[in-house]
Design a protein with these regions (language model features):
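Fe(II)/2-oxoglutarate oxygenase catalytic core
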Residues: 2-524
Length: 524
C-alpha cells in the first residue's frame, strides 16, 4: 500500500494542472532509421532469415539470438536529458531476491510527467506498430514499462524473461559515459541442445539514448552483469511488448542427484574429529530440544580445532580440481572433484557420510537417520502407509552400506545423503527454479564452512530459506568458520545462496576473498 500511496501523492491535483498546461513540450521524434520504410522492410527480412543487418544507428544481430540495437533512439538530446531528470525524481523501491538486486520505480503506465508520458506514447504507439510489422505479429496495446537504477554491486542474474504474454523485451539506456570495466553490461548467453544457457556469447555495454530489444524465446537467456563502478548509476527504461508467445519445448529435467547410504564407520571417527562437548549425551538432548522447537541450529566450534585448521589449509591446495557448476540460470559456483581431495579433506567427507555421524545427527535432531533412533508417535503416523506386517527389526538392515528400494518404486527405507565440497568466490550464487520446487522433499541440510574468518555479510554468500513462491526470507545462514548449521526443511521450503558480489574481492583487500564449505543433505 505504501508504494501506491506514494504514487498517488506524486500526482497531486496542483501538479496535475501544471502538467496539463505543458503543451509546449516538444513531441518526441524517433531515430530516423525507424521512420524509413526501406529500413523496416530490410529489418523484417533479416529477422525472419536470422541474418545480420545494419544501417546508420540501427543494427540487427542474430547471435546468440535475435536482438536489435538502435542508437540515438530519441532524436532530441534536450528531450532525453529532461526524460532522465524526470525519471531520477521518481520514487524507487529496493528489489532484492535470489535473482536480482536493484532499485525499481513504480509502474510508469499512468505517469503524467510530460517527457515520461511522451516516451511511453511513442514506444507503445508508433514504435509498437513498427515492431509488429517487423515481426509479422500483432502486438497488444498492453503498456508494461518501469524504470530501473543499478548502482554498485547491483545485478540481475541469468534468466530468459519467460512469462505468459511477453513477446519482446526492451531497454532504453540513460547512462553517463560507460565502459565495460564499469560492469552493468547486458550479457547474452549461448544455449546447448537442451535449451539451457551455457556461456556468455555477447556483452552489450550500455550507452546513452540506446534502445536494445530482443524477442522473448526459449533461448533468450541474458543477465545484467554486476555494476562495478562505485560512482555511476545505470539508469534505464525497460519493459515488454506483449503478444502471442512463441512455442516452447518441454522443460529440460536435470538428472537426479545420486543419494548414498552411510559408510560403515563406527564411533571412533567421531572421537577423532568432533568437539567432545557435542558427544555428551545430555548436551545432545539439549540440542535436540532446541532443534525440535525451531527446526534449525548452529553448532559452533564443531570440529576439534586442530582438525579444523588442517582441513582449512588443505582446501587451499592447488592439487584440488575445482569444477564449475551450472547452468547459470540455476547455479554458478565451484565443486571439488572427490578424487582430487587431500587426505584430511577426504577423511572429513567420510566423517559426514559415516554411520556414526548419521546416528549423531539423529540424536541432534530426532530424525530417523539411523535404525537405533527411537520412533515416536508422529513418525509412526508418517509411515502409516508402510507395508502391512513390517516389523521394527527389518529396519536394522538399514545399517548395511547398500540401499535397496522397496517393491513398487517406494522410497528406500535406508536413510541416504548427498553432498559436495564447494568453493565460493566473486560471482558465485545459486537460484531458485521450478524444477527444484517440484522435486522438493523433507530433508536435513548440513553446512560446514571453512576459510571465512573475515567474511562480511555485505559480501553475499549467505544461504537463504524461503517459502515456495514467496520472497520473504524465513531463515538466513551466515558463513562462519567451524560452525555446523543444521536446517530441516519441508516440501514448501526452498533455499538459495546469495550472489557473492564485488565487495568480496576489492583491490583494498589483502587477498581475493573466497570461502569453502561441506554441503550435505540427509533424507530419512
Amino acid at each position: 500500500m505504501s508504494s501506491k500511496r506514494a504514487q498517488d501523492e506524486s500526482g497531486a491535483t496542483g501538479r496535475k494542472k501544471k502538467k496539463r498546461s505543458s503543451s509546449s513540450v516538444e513531441a518526441v521524434e524517433l531515430c530516423g532509421a525507424v521512420e524509413e520504410e526501406e529500413v523496416k522492410t530490410a529489418v523484417k527480412e533479416a529477422w525472419s532469415s536470422r541474418t545480420h543487418y545494419s544501417k546508420g544507428d540501427l543494427e540487427l544481430d542474430c547471435s546468440p539470438f535475435p536482438h536489435c540495437i538502435i542508437k540515438n533512439f530519441l532524436s532530441s538530446q534536450t528531450f532525453v536529458e529532461n526524460l532522465q531528470r524526470e525519471l531520477l525524481e521518481l520514487n524507487f523501491n529496493e528489489k532484492s531476491n535470489d535473482l536480482y538486486k536493484f532499485k525499481q520505480s513504480d509502474d510508469l503506465k499512468k505517469r503524467k510527467e510530460p517527457h515520461i508520458a511522451a516516451t511511453r506514447a511513442a514506444l507503445f504507439g508508433r514504435f509498437r506498430s513498427w515492431l509488429g510489422d517487423v515481426l509479422g505479429v500483432e502486438l497488444e496495446p498492453t503498456v508494461d514499462i518501469s524504470c530501473a537504477k543499478y548502482e554498485y554491486t547491483d545485478v540481475l542474474l541469468c534468466h530468459d524473461d519467460e512469462l505468459e504474454g511477453r513477446r519482446v523485451a526492451f531497454i532504453l539506456y540513460l547512462v553517463p559515459p560507460w565502459q565495460s570495466s564499469d560492469g552493468g553490461s547486458l550479457d547474452l548467453y549461448s544455449t546447448d541442445g537442451n535449451f539451457q544457457p551455457e556461456s556468455i556469447a555477447k556483452s552489450l555495454v550500455p550507452s546513452w539514448n540506446t534502445l536494445v530489444l530482443f524477442e522473448v524465446s526459449p533461448v533468450s537467456f541474458h543477465q545484467v552483469s554486476e555494476v562495478l563502478s562505485q560512482d555511476k548509476c545505470r539508469l534505464s527504461l525497460s519493459g515488454w511488448f506483449h503478444g502471442p508467445s512463441l512455442e516452447r519445448p518441454p522443460r529440460f529435467k536435470e538428472p537426479s542427484i545420486l543419494k548414498h547410504p552411510h559408510l560403515p564407520r563406527d564411533e571412533t571417527v567421531l572421537f577423532e574429529w568432533i568437539n567432545p562437548l557435542y558427544l555428551d549425551i545430555s548436551y545432545q538432548e539439549q540440542i535436540q530440544t532446541e532443534f525440535e522447537d525451531s527446526s534449525e541450529i548452529q553448532l559452533k566450534d564443531f570440529l576439534k580445532e586442530e582438525k579444523f585448521r588442517e582441513v582449512s589449509e588443505a582446501l587451499r591446495q592447488t592439487r584440488i580440481q575445482w569444477m564449475k557448476r551450472g547452468p547459470p540460470n540455476k547455479r554458478c559456483y565451484e565443486s571439488a572433484s572427490l578424487d582430487s581431495l587431500p587426505e584430511c579433506v577426504s577423511a572429513c567427507w567420510e566423517l559426514l557420510r559415516s554411520e556414526a555421524f548419521f546416528l549423531l545427527l539423529s540424536n541432534f535432531t530426532g530424525l530417523h537417520l539411523h535404525f537405533l533412533c527411537p520412533a515416536d508417535e508422529e513418525d509412526e503416523e508418517k509411515e502409516d502407509d508402510a507395508e502391512e506386517g513390517e516389523v521394527a527389526g527389518t529396519s536394522a538392515e538399514s545399517s548395511s552400506s547398500t540401499a535397496a528400494a522397496d517393491d513398487g518404486g517406494r522410497k528406500p527405507s535406508t536413510p541416504v545423503c548427498c553432498g559436495e565440497v564447494r568453493r565460493w568466490s566473486h560471482g558465485s550464487y545459486t537460484l531458485l527454479h521450478d524444477a527444484e520446487a517440484a522435486q522438493a522433499e523433507y530433508a536435513l541440510d548440513l553446512i560446514l564452512p571453512f576459510g571465512c574468518a573475515d567474511w562480511q555479510t555485505e559480501f553475499g554468500g549467505l544461504t537463504c530459506y524461503v517459502a515456495n513462491e514467496e520472497d520473504e526470507e524465513l531463515l538466513t545462514v551466515y558463513p562462519e568458520d567451524n560452525s555446523l548449521a543444521l536446517v530441516y526443511r519441508d516440501k514448501e521450503t526452498l533455499k538459495f545462496v546469495k550472489h557473492v558480489n564485488h565487495k568480496s574481492s576489492r583491490v583494498d583487500s589483502s587477498t581475493c576473498r573466497e570461502f569453502y564449505d561441506f554441503s550435505f543433505v540427509y533424507y530419512e
